[in-house]
Amino acid sequence: FCLSRGLGDVYKRQPIVEIEAISKMLKFAKDVDCPVELVHVSSWEAMELAKKAKAEGQHVLVETCPHYLLLDESYVEKYGAYAKCNPALRKKEDVERLWDYVKDGTVDFIGSDHSPFLKSEKEKLDKDGKKDIFLSPSGFPGIDLRLPLMVTEGLKRGVSLERIVELLSVNPAKCFNIFPQKGTISAGADGDLVIVDMNREVICHAEDSYSQAKDISKVFEGWKFICGVYATVVRGRVVYENGKVDESAAGWGQFVKPVRK
């Protein structure tokens, strides 16, 4: 499956490209006194630029994703296009170093960069009928794995549950100006809750996912989680419980309007 070409995609998306782009963005934002959000930050050098800008008083928000904290470029060799993403996965030493910026507060929140595609899209063929990673779209599913991945791997590395809640819930709500309607358990806030069983070990299997893109969910297959989501509550209504989605809740979602400041 074009594994030999897999690293070609990684090599053409080197960290220097990300570093240069973020350096320019921070300069432009500073010149016009504009807040800026840096998403999917994958290299420690780029993180260092953001950390320095914050220390100098710039309004900078930083997001990264579980796969940049946990997967290195060897996964592209192993899974080919199924591990292709933008920015590309980095070297192992880069991956572990990113956790320093999670711990010191440089990273404001963790996204999923959930990118669902059909298997036929991921396995694009070239003119000779061969699968070609360069024709495959970038990204893979991850929205349902963000919480168990961050709890499991974060606790291993000394990140507290309180900090994980900030990264996954509180800070995203603040970033998009929907706090305190979202992102907090308090009077007047929406009754949005995730009930997590911390005594339940779960093995990640794509076939258990509710995502329609589970056919391309390969990179975390077989990973062990120290917790499992028991229930999800949206505006006071239980929409998921003990492995089952309440299909009658379809349409229960509402547009969340940001508060303009």
Region locations from a protein language model:
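His/Asp/Glu-enriched, well-ordered alpha-helical/loop segment
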Residues: 12-24, 28-33, 82, 109-110, ...
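Active-site glycine- and acidic-residue-rich loops that bind
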Residues: 37-52, 85-99, 175-178
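Single conserved hydrophobic/aromatic residue that forms the stacking wall/gate
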Residues: 1-11
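Active-site loop ensemble at the mouth of alpha/beta enzyme cores that anchors a bound cofactor
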Residues: 58-59, 66-104, 109, 116-147, ...
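C-terminal cap of metal-dependent C-N hydrolases
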Residues: 124-132, 190-255
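Helix C-cap/helix->beta junction micro-motif
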Residues: 32, 53-56
